[in-house]
Amino acid sequence: MKLTLLRHGETEGSRRDLYYGAADIPVLPEALEALRHKALTGIYPTAGHYCVSGLQRTIQTLHAIYGDVGYTVLPGLREMDFGDFEMRAYAGDLEHDPQFIAWCEDVEHNICPHGESAAQVLARSVAAIEPVLRRGEDTVCVIHGGVTSGLMIHWFGGILYDYSPAPGTGYQVIFDGEKPLNYTNIG
């Protein structure tokens, strides 16, 4: 089975280096157009099944790349809820926030105030992707950078920065049953 994980297209949040996970912000119009053109090159794998997290940026990206295909919404693949840090930038804002500084001491385990921890996001992401793997059908999931990174670390080891896909890029993972064998970069 081939499982393709693609990060949604560029948003105002990614352009401004904001912490945005739960915020349902759109892909920039020019980024959608760039994805449409990139898709014409054939760089994106196709599949028999498509999934999104349900946030508009994932649905917009799916349609920009694959057109009007049917899809399944898997809310468990939504990005981390940064709680009180949502839609805020580090520079000039969060760098002075004592709660943010405390969270940064262990971002993998500390919970964002009124949000989630990376461990909580990984647990729900793994639970959400397990039925897809059990089905065994080639699948494309248009999701989020943090979720993609977490799943890749879970399957292949490493650290967050080993698997931080840029908008519109990702990985194709080859599975034998539910066992990940290897991966290639997409985009």
Task: Place the predicted regions along the sequence by residue.
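Short, acidic/turn-prone active-site loops that include or flank metal/cofactor-
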Residues: 24, 76-79, 167-170
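Active-site-proximal alpha-helix that buttresses catalytic centers in soluble enzyme cores
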Residues: 2-69
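Phosphate-handling substructures
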Residues: 65-124
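Short active-site segment of divalent metal-dependent hydrolases/proteases
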Residues: 11, 147-148
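Generic beta-sheet signal
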Residues: 3, 48, 136-146
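Active-site signature of alpha/beta-hydrolase-fold catalytic machinery across serine-
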Residues: 64, 150-154
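Domain-level recognition of soluble alpha/beta enzyme cores
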Residues: 158-184
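Short beta-strand scaffold positions
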Residues: 52-53, 123, 142-143
